């Protein structure tokens, strides 16, 4: 128990009482001396109190010092750990990031200590290592302005499993939200009254209803499932006037329908104050919720690289740690559209037309009359303005004006009624599309041999100014369109371009160039003429093409099999790949040999051989191949009795030349060396005659 100030005062009062008592005693007995034990006790108490107070002061100072040292130690340790687990190392060029002008007024000191510490370490030309997660923490300022909520594949599967789990929750109501710039965020967050009184365009019905052909739209977003279903509110087209891409929060007006005890009704629709963060979250989450939804119709903004986020350049640089996420993002986002286009048009067109016209199953990806075509990587930008509509058969022409499109409108309505009974799901629709493409390409007058393109019927290109819809019952024959010039022809590389180069113009092309009589499609689907089934068997052309690409060494199979080991040879095709890697055409060099000369037979290559030099241990083939250097062999008795010593005899020059010519004549199959060699100059020419070694396989 430590002495306190109260105890010290109590001791002092005790000492005073004792002093007065001894004073009284001294007056009565003046000669008596004071008690030495009592004096020692008082002195002891005073010294003890002084000692304890000093100890307390020293201890508090030591503790403060230790605390300060511990903080410094922790900071140093944290810096070391960040340097160990760093993900990036940049060579800092001394340019300090300028602070964002929006965030400047928020904190008086400018930036927090993390940034200051990072900037303090970065002097010119030093290597700066840091943990990029610490820098991404800065993006929490300015209400998460550049923040993007990216779903990785793990999150995606987790969400998928969560969707299949039966939670007893009422269906969640989600407003479909377009991404808008920060300037429009205030206008976009204010709720607009719903313009139509009809029920919302419900892409996913609650589990009570049956899923009809209407209810399953082409964009199958993730949150709606067999159990936890989602109603997507429609977009009111009136909002396109004030903000370029408006958000209709009809969930505010009709939110009471779906709000149960678990849902928070104020979260979605009530005020712009409460719903701002949720709207922002769904704005960023919308694209990732479905990987393939209606993405071609939306403009995808690039990531905003804030100046304080130095590590965000990793998204554009190809660092191997990010490749997986770049692939995931590329799978989930559509490509950037060129130019500034109104991106909300498609959904507003659907919402204003009502859900009866929104997703007619025969033509699911028709764009609105004003919206641009979806950007496909295979389409050229120059052709995007006037291309044919998605599945338009080629007879409908390459450029259809709006007048032509309006002539065909009653026809389209009729065809849509017919087709709604037959195309119930995506797969039957796709099969019918393929059949339609097959028959249309038979009648087509677009030259496959010239363009290397199947006509644009199955390419899925979008419609420029309101192109004609596909007529799925037998296509009405309009007069054949003019062929585009070769310069303007689309260079779409399709699957059948290989066939187009092989087959040339088929017989069907000439037939269909005759003007066909106009015929109207029969009324009932059963009366339609039976389309040819698609044949998936491989014909001879495909087989020949296939084997042409997979050809291998022809002498390999003819050689007798060596059974000495289990696998004496490399596999034929593998060996073929390893041998002729650098030569384009295997048969080209040998094809020009004169027919009278017999090709030398070559033993099959064994493991480790190259094409023309066998390894040192193995002798040259007896039949003799083309050697790169002519080998001059000695005569059998050459080293023997004629010249004792080393066998280097000086023979007359004529005999030596005759010998050389004879051996060259045996070794080379060229008829040029048949005449006798006269002089040494001709010999030089003859020795140079074996041309550079032939690297093609035998």
UniProtKB/Swiss-Prot annotation:
Negatively regulates voltage-gated calcium channels by preventing the interaction between their alpha and beta subunits. Thereby, negatively regulates calcium channels activity at the plasma membrane and indirectly inhibits calcium-regulated exocytosis. Residues 459-468 have a biased composition (Gly residues). The modification Phosphoserine is found at residues 290, 295, 501, 520, 524, 610, 692, 696. The modification Phosphothreonine is found at residue 691. GO terms for biological process: negative regulation of calcium ion transmembrane transport; negative regulation of calcium ion-dependent exocytosis; negative regulation of voltage-gated calcium channel activity. InterPro entries: CBARP (IPR037658). Expressed by neurons in the cortex, cerebellum and hippocampus and by pancreatic beta cells (at protein level). Residues 185-197, 402-413 have a biased composition (Low complexity). Residues 562-576 have a biased composition (Basic residues). Interacts with voltage-dependent calcium channels CACNB1, CACNB2, CACNB3 and CACNB4 beta subunits; prevents their interaction with the CACNA1C alpha subunit thereby negatively regulating the activity of the corresponding calcium channels. It comes from the Eukaryota. It is found in: Cytoplasmic vesicle, Secretory vesicle, Synaptic vesicle membrane; Cell membrane; Cell projection, Growth cone. Residues 483-493 have a biased composition (Basic and acidic residues). GO terms for molecular function: transmembrane transporter binding. This is Voltage-dependent calcium channel beta subunit-associated regulatory protein. Keywords: Cell membrane, Cell projection, Cytoplasmic vesicle, Glycoprotein, Membrane, Phosphoprotein, Synapse, Transmembrane, Transmembrane helix. Residues 90-124, 185-275, 308-339, 360-421, 438-536, 554-648 are annotated as: Disordered. One of its GO terms (cellular component) is synaptic vesicle membrane. The chain crosses the membrane at residues 42-62. Residues 63-698 are cytoplasmic. It comes from Mus musculus. Its main location: membrane. It is a single-pass type III membrane protein. Residues 1-41 are extracellular. Glycans are attached at residue 25.
